[in-house]
Amino acid sequence: MGIVEGITEWLPISSTGHMILLEQIVKFNASEEFMCMFRVVIQLGAILAVVVLFWGKLWPFGLRQGRVISKPSVWSLWFKVVAATLPVLVISPLDDWMEAHFYNYITVAAMLILYGVLFLVVENRRATPHVMRLDQITYRDALLIGVWQCLAIIPGTSRSGATIVGGLLLGLSRACVAEFTFYLAIPVMAGASLLKVLKFALSGAAMTGTEIAVLVVGCVVAFAVSMGAIRFLMDYVKRHNFKFFGVYRIVLGLIVLAVAAITALA
């Protein structure tokens, strides 16, 4: 699961869509409460990969002639990340309800296919992007991308998929929106992971030594794989568009529907 998380969290192909298939193929001997928490908490490893890879762009302090200086451009970037996170805070109370009612084959397949089609439509517009650098992103852009990010509350949507589609429609270049999407993950995924751990602890549940080891290994694997996935996507979008991911999502959605039909008939 750490490998799947590390790859699918950053590519716009829906980690949930892959997880729901993986859970069908591989039967995990763990409680539903632990698995629910595990799926979210291993994202911490993925987030750490972003911090490590982009540390120079994310740390707002530097040294000049032996003195600590502040970097206004980095602070501006963080303020825009915060602006994009605000819409998520508004809808976050619905997260558990959405997972309980819509974490199923049909919803996941529908979102996979829908956003697959959206990627193809958006890329076929032949529109010329006017936002090529992160410092050209306005607070309005950031807030609207945050609204798109809210759609990821629906299982199968893909957080990166929603924000990339939104960013492309707003006129961001592929490389710019991909990088901004990585940064948005830091507060959103870290907050979601910590909230899941807190809820798990308050429920009175306790992890066994084996479960703790599995969680740690999952985070480490997610970190290592994420390093490669992020590098791959940043290099890929410099030379290609997102049509491949659109087709991939549609095919995966059809596979999920087929698995749902087979499961229902079994």
Where do the model's predicted regions map?
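Multi-pass membrane proteins that catalyze or facilitate reactions on polyprenyl-/lipid-phosphate substrates
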Residues: 1-266
